[in-house]
UniProtKB/Swiss-Prot annotation:
It catalyses: 2-succinylbenzoate + ATP + CoA = 2-succinylbenzoyl-CoA + AMP + diphosphate. Belongs to the ATP-dependent AMP-binding enzyme family. MenE subfamily. CDD domains: OSB_CoA_lg (cd05912). GO terms for molecular function: ATP binding; o-succinylbenzoate-CoA ligase activity. It is an enzyme of class 6 (ligase). Pathway: Quinol/quinone metabolism; 1,4-dihydroxy-2-naphthoate biosynthesis; 1,4-dihydroxy-2-naphthoate from chorismate: step 5/7; Quinol/quinone metabolism; menaquinone biosynthesis. It comes from Staphylococcus aureus (strain MRSA252). This is 2-succinylbenzoate--CoA ligase. The lineage of its organism: Bacteria, Bacillati, Bacillota, Bacilli, Bacillales.
Length: 492
């Protein structure tokens, strides 16, 4: 198959591929820049590299250049500690890291994009492409890679089953795992998203989620497959994002629930040109859904994983109005089922589809990942008679107290409705009698007593579900995409 960027450069070359508000690159420009850089990257003779990058045009060029040079990219979360980065990269045998941000990491060859010399004018485009932006390329270092060197030859096609990217699970429930994502996985995910969410060549997608996460990278893949424009943003600022929505004809945006909340607080009280607000990464509260729908905001709740190359369940505004707790229905190209449902229909969510990874790169000895072709997500879910899917909790988060299954989300939902509580999370606390009992961590600026909380929660929850321990904290641990890191709260 032809590289998607190469195909867009041929068929959709003058369309804007990427803009940061200051610079804009057409698909022709993007392909030319990526091709020139790819020749430089091939000189490093690496089949797999780490990427330590920001949300920028240069980072996007680097990603495509790696693919054109047949290099697998391992995405590095820039919020990790040096030790965490080292452990991740060593686990998958990465020796070299390309970066668009300053990085010092012992034991690796670190190469800044600014230090990579560009090839010049000997790239062949067969007359298909032209430099419509008038970009000037520096040809003074032409001898760095000989023109006829094998490393100077770029492929314009690829194998769908080759690994495109490697990401590590967010580590919200334990040790991180290396997830290989093939071009086929990404393509199937994009097609499923188009069917369930909807986008076309006229889409203008504002992307502020980190590229090093699947939620950010998947937008770039959808764009290059379909040929639409991405408005890339490096950092989330509610005031600035709202201004972009108002003034830049933004049709699509990917957010986590908290960032949507900040935007509504900032004044996002009408859709403007927005056609789709794609939400994911954390649970969406009923109150937020109600507020967003009152503003006629086109919110689409979703559920996906690193292992599934982003979303595979999507809930439309109509679905959310009918059932606020749903994450919707599966994309047409995937199959989902519930394993071993209990009397309430709750069981482990299983998925099968071309978007699902084939198995972890690290650790390689994990068992129970797949069963009869279905990937075990590890989530407790339900599929109702209309086909709506509800996600309740990670199986690892389930609290088993005296033989009773307790879903933390149910307790958290009730606790967050208590006046003065800003945020709350419930985890299992070791107990000599019951094995585990619920413990509630909460954030509040008010003085709330344990007795007050017990009295309130007892009105809404069965006695065995009422937390036995409470702890007020300043903040709760979240990842950069808004996922709660419960494992950091598991302590005696």
């Amino acid at each position: 198959m032809d590289f998607w960027l190469y195909k867009q450069a041929q068929q959709n070359g003058h369309h804007i591929a990427i803009t940061d508000g200051q610079e804009s690159y057409t698909y022709q420009n993007l392909y030319c820049e990526a091709s020139l850089l790819a020749k430089r990257l091939k000189a490093y003779q690496q089949s797999r590299v780490g990427l330590y990058i920001d949300n920028s045009i240069q980072s996007i060029i680097l990603i495509h250049a790696c693919w054109l040079a047949n290099i697998e990219i391992a995405m590095i979360n820039t919020r990790l500690t040096p030790n965490e980065m080292t452990n991740q990269m060593r686990s998958i045998d990465v020796q070299l890291i390309f970066c668009t941000l300053p990085l010092e990491l012992r034991g690796f060859q670190i190469v800044s994009l600014d230090d990579i010399e560009f090839a010049g004018t000997d790239i062949t485009t067969n007359g298909l492409l032209d430099n419509t932006m008038g970009i000037q390329y520096d040809t003074s270092n032409e001898t760095v890679v000989p023109k006829d060197s094998p490393s100077n030859i770029l492929n314009t096609s690829f194998n769908l089953d080759d690994i495109a990217s490697i990401m590590f699970t967010s580590g919200t429930t334990g040790p991180q795992k290396a997830v290989p994502q093939t071009f086929r996985n990404h393509y199937a995910s994009a097609i499923g998203c188009k069917e369930s969410l909807g986008f076309d060549r006229d889409t203008n997608w504002l992307s502020v989620l980190p590229i090093y996460h699947i939620s950010g990278l998947s937008v770039l893949l959808r764009a290059v497959i379909e040929g639409f424009t991405v408005r890339i943003v490096d950092k989330f600022n509610a005031e600035q994002i709202l201004t972009m929505i108002k003034n830049e004809r933004i049709t699509h945006i990917s957010l986590v629930p908290q960032t949507l909340n900040w935007l509504m607080q900032q004044g996002l009280h009408e859709p403007y040109d927005l056609q789709k607000i794609l939400l994911g990464g954390a649970k969406l509260s009923a109150s937020m859904i109600e507020t967003a729908l009152q503003y006629n905001l086109p919110i689409y709740n979703s559920f996906g994983m690193t292992e599934t190359c982003s979303q595979f369940l999507t809930a439309t505004p109509e679905m959310l109005h009918a059932r606020p707790d749903t994450v919707g229905m599966p994309s047409a190209n995937v199959d989902v089922k519930i394993k071993n449902p209990n009397k309430k229909g709750h069981g482990e969510l299983m998925i099968k589809g071309a978007n699902v990874m084939n198995g972890y790169l690290y650790p390689t000895d994990l068992t129970g990942t797949f069963e009869n072709g279905y990937f075990n997500t590890g989530d407790i879910a339900e599929i109702d008679h209309e086909g709506y899917v509800m996600i309740y909790d990670r199986r690892k988060d389930l609290i088993i107290s005296g033989g009773e299954n307790i879903y933390p989300y149910q307790i958290e939902t009730v606790a967050k409705q208590f006046p003065g509580i800003i945020d709350a999370v419930c985890v299992g606390h070791p107990d000599d009698t019951w094995g585990q009992v619920p413990k509630l961590y909460f954030v509040s600026e008010s003085n709330i007593s344990k007795a007050q909380l017990i009295a309130y929660l007892s009105q809404h929850l069965a006695k065995y579900k009422v937390p036995k321990h409470f702890e007020k904290v300043d903040t709760l641990p979240y990842t950069s995409t808004g996922k709660l890191q419960r494992n950091k709260l598991y302590r005696g």
